């Protein structure tokens, strides 16, 4: 632990002791213990790095007792929040939309961004050397698609294309289903496909940021940037939010929002413990920011409840 983080931990403990005395606001008494749900990383069991420091930091922010609840998967996390066993949950975009569909009782509070300003992803259909001229020509070409559980490479494009009246059946003869996203990319590189579905990271205004996405990996595999063309691009799918129950007291929301949106600038080591994948900090978000995720969940539900 860095010296700055140790110093912050000491201040948090001292300040928490001062804040959390017997005189509490009614909303704190009503809640009793504020519970935060999180899904552990694969193979981590019930362990969360820096759990003690994170717990004390949220305790300090809210001025009340806080506990972290580690769920085995998103389905368990959703049930816990829907049944009011936790007040706060850290979701993927589609898990949040599933929770909203399940109970209508959750609202997004903040979501992470990348250091370069990317706030989510957009699906893309990429071709090489102009082989695919447009969506209308797909039926006469070979189109690689990642597996059905790939959000950016399968679920998002299927949902968006259906909304654009260019619906693709999952068993369409021109689709080549790949076992992984990497396998779909290899098909394009090796010439076994004329185009592939994939994704790019995108900023809030929707402009694509290609680093780290499918096009960047294709270029790393040897394709020239000038040989790749984007045939189609979806709307923005935001990174998953930190969500609270809709009945959470406004003062608790305010305290959490102030704490989270300032966390990266005030205590970056603590931010990295809470959010390890997107290093740019937290921004406030609203339900409308997850309209795309909700549409994906509706598609999955209509298609037989595939999770």
What are these regions (language model features)?
Residues 6-19:
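Bacterial N-terminal signal peptides
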Residues 21-25:
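Sec/Tat signal peptide C-region and signal peptidase I cleavage site
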Residues 27-53, 244-307:
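An extracytoplasmic/periplasmic, membrane-proximal ligand-sensing/linker region
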Residues 31, 35-59, 94, 118-186, ...:
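Bilobed "Venus flytrap"/periplasmic-binding protein-like clamshell domains
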Residues 38-40, 70-74, 84-102, 111-112, ...:
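Beta->alpha turn/N-cap motifs
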Residues 39-40, 122-132, 234-251:
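A bilobed periplasmic-binding-protein/Venus flytrap-type ligand-binding module shared by bacterial periplasmic
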Residues 105-118, 227-233:
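A structural signal for short loop-to-beta-strand junctions that line the ligand-binding cleft
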Residues 142-249:
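Pocket-lining segment of extracytoplasmic ligand-binding domains
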């Amino acid at each position: 632990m860095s010296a700055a983080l140790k110093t912050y931990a000491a201040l948090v403990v001292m300040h928490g002791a001062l804040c959390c005395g017997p005189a509490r606001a009614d909303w704190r008494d009503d809640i009793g213990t504020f519970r935060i749900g999180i899904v552990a990383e694969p193979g981590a069991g019930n362990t969360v790095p820096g759990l003690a420091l994170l717990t004390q930091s949220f305790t300090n922010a809210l001025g009340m007792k806080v506990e972290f609840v580690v769920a085995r998967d998103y389905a368990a996390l959703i049930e816990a929040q829907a049944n009011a066993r936790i007040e706060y949950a850290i979701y993927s975009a589609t898990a949040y939309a599933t929770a909203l569909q399940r109970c209508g009782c959750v609202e997004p509070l903040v979501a992470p961004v990348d250091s370069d300003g990317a706030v989510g992803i957009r699906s893309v259909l990429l071709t090489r050397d102009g082989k695919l001229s447009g969506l209308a020509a797909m039926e006469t070409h070979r189109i690689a698609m990642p597996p059905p559980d790939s959000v950016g490479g399968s679920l998002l494009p299927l949902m968006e294309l259906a909304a654009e009246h260019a619906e693709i059946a999952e068993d369409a003869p021109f689709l080549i289903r790949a076992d992984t996203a990497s396998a779909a990319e290899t098909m394009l590189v090796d010439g076994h496909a004329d185009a592939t579905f994939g994704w790019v990271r995108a900023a809030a205004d929707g402009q694509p940021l290609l680093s780290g996405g499918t096009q960047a990996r294709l270029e790393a595999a040897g394709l020239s940037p000038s040989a790749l063309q984007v045939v189609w691009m979806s709307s923005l799918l935001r990174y998953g939010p930190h969500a609270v129950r809709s009945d959470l007291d406004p003062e608790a929301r305010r305290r959490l929002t102030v704490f989270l949106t300032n966390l990266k600038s005030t205590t970056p080591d603590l931010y990295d413990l809470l959010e390890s994948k997107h290093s740019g900090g937290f921004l406030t978000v609203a339900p409308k920011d997850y309209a795309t995720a909700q549409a994906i969940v509706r598609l999955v539900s209509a298609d037989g409840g595939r999770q």
